[in-house]
A protein has these predicted regions:
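Ligand-binding "clamshell"
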Residues: 1-6, 122-140
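Extracytoplasmic substrate-binding proteins
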Residues: 1-66, 87-89, 94, 106, ...
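Short secondary-structure boundary/capping segments
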Residues: 50-51, 75, 133-135
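Short, well-ordered secondary-structure micro-motifs
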Residues: 69-72, 123-125
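His/Asp/Glu-enriched short active-site or ligand-binding loop at hydrolase and phosphoryl-transfer sites
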Residues: 73-95, 115, 142-144
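Hydrophobic residues within well-ordered alpha-helices
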Residues: 78, 103-104
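Short acidic active-site motifs
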Residues: 97-102
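A ligand-binding cleft/hinge motif common to bilobed small-molecule-binding domains
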Residues: 110-127
Length: 173
C-alpha cells in the first residue's frame, strides 16, 4: 500500500520506552515533543520517589494464577514505585501462572490485579476468590490497577507507578 511502517520494540523497561518515544517522535518530525513527553514522564516518576531500603513485598495476580515476574512492565512499575516483586524474587520470568500454594507460601504484603473486563464468573476468575486467598487477603489488600496501563508500554507507565505509590502509602502507615 506504500505506507511507511515503523515497528516499536514494545519493551518492558523505562529506558526502552524512552527509546521508542524518541524513535517515533523523530519519524514524525516531532523530536521536541518527544523529549518533552519524556521529561514530563521522568518528572512524574521522580515525584514521590521512595528511598526505603526495605521495600515491602508485592505481587501481581491475574485470573488463572498468572503473575508478572522479571522482564514485565509490572515488574518495572513495582520497582519504580518502591515495591519488591516477590514473583521476580522467586525466579518467575515474564507472565507465568503460579500455583496458588506458592502464592500463599510467599505471603505477599499486597496483591495487585488488573481486570481485562467486567468481573465474571469464569473458572480463571474464581481463583482470585479462592477461600485460601480470601484468608490471606483478610489482612492484606488486593489493589486494582486498571489494565489500560499495561496494554502496551508508553507514557502511561508513569500513571501506573503513581497508583502503585498511592497503594504503598496505605501500607507504610
Amino acid at each position: 500500500m506504500g505506507y511507511p511502517l515503523h515497528q516499536l520494540s514494545l519493551g518492558n523497561r523505562l529506558d526502552t520506552i524512552h527509546t521508542d518515544i524518541r524513535q517515533l517522535a523523530a519519524r514524525l518530525g516531532q523530536v521536541s515533543r518527544g523529549e518533552s513527553l519524556i521529561r514530563e514522564m521522568q518528572q512524574r516518576l521522580h515525584t514521590g520517589e521512595d528511598k526505603n531500603p526495605q521495600p515491602p513485598g508485592a505481587l501481581f495476580l491475574q485470573p488463572r494464577g498468572y503473575t508478572s515476574g522479571t522482564d514485565t512492565l509490572q515488574d518495572e512499575a513495582l520497582r519504580l514505585a518502591g515495591w519488591h516483586n516477590l514473583a521476580a524474587q522467586h525466579g518467575v520470568k515474564g507472565y507465568t501462572p503460579v500455583p496458588l500454594e506458592e502464592i500463599l507460601r510467599w505471603q505477599p504484603g499486597t496483591l495487585f490485579t488488573s481486570s481485562f473486563s467486567e468481573s465474571g464468573d469464569s473458572l480463571a476468575e474464581r481463583q482470585l476468590r479462592h477461600p485460601a486467598l480470601k484468608r490471606l487477603l483478610a489482612k492484606r489488600p488486593m489493589v486494582e490497577i486498571p489494565f489500560k496501563y499495561w496494554i502496551c508500554p508508553g507514557p502511561m507507565l508513569a500513571d501506573a507507578v503513581a497508583l502503585l505509590r498511592q497503594a504503598r502509602e496505605g501500607v507504610d502507615q
